[in-house]
Amino acid sequence: MGQKTFTEINNYRSGVIQENVVIFDTNILIDLFYPGNINRRSQQILNKLDDIYIDCLQQGKEIKIIIPIVSEFYNLAFKVALDNYNRNNGLRLKRKQFRKEPNFNIYNTGIISIIDNFSSQFKIEQYKFNYNNIVDKETKLLKLDFTDLIISTFCEEENACLVTLDKDFRKTFRRNLKFSIISNW
């Protein structure tokens, strides 16, 4: 295993990723595939993310995705659809109520189509996360949410480079990199 690096996204250049496996965190998938810039990123950041994605494809990197990331993507997209539906219709529906709305299927089908699109370009890994084998889970879970614990463990085990804009990864691993990270400072 080579040296692990932290690369600030603004300093990313083609060839920075030395690992063969790359993981795009949920927030990156949203920026790359979900319409409307819901994360309100600057055009400069969006262009960098596009560059990273294109470089990975051109360099033949194996882009993997695990089910917790797909789940986070669906849940976030669902929340955005619900919020937009409520705002546009002057409603205050909850998730279960929204599912019963006549237009729900349109939103749901759209979200599933986006997931199908990026899933067809990546390798969906059937990752068996073993919670009991995480020796420093108490420390990591002080800074990471549980899904991020799963993602970081996967990246470490797969020797993968994680592309994320979630500062929790930087804060948790900056002094003791277990895997390479491309993120914001």
Residue ranges and their predicted role:
Residues D50-K64, P68-K140:
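PIN-domain endoribonuclease scaffold, especially VapC-family toxins
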Residues Q44, L142-K143:
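Residues that cap or flank secondary-structure elements
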Residues M1-I17, S152-W185:
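Acidic, PIN/NYN-like endoribonuclease modules and their adjacent C-terminal/linker elements
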Residues F24-N27, I65-I66, K143-F146, D166, ...:
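Histidine- and aromatic-rich ligand-binding microenvironments
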Residues I28, I69, I150-I151, D168-F169:
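Alpha-helix capping/helix-boundary segments
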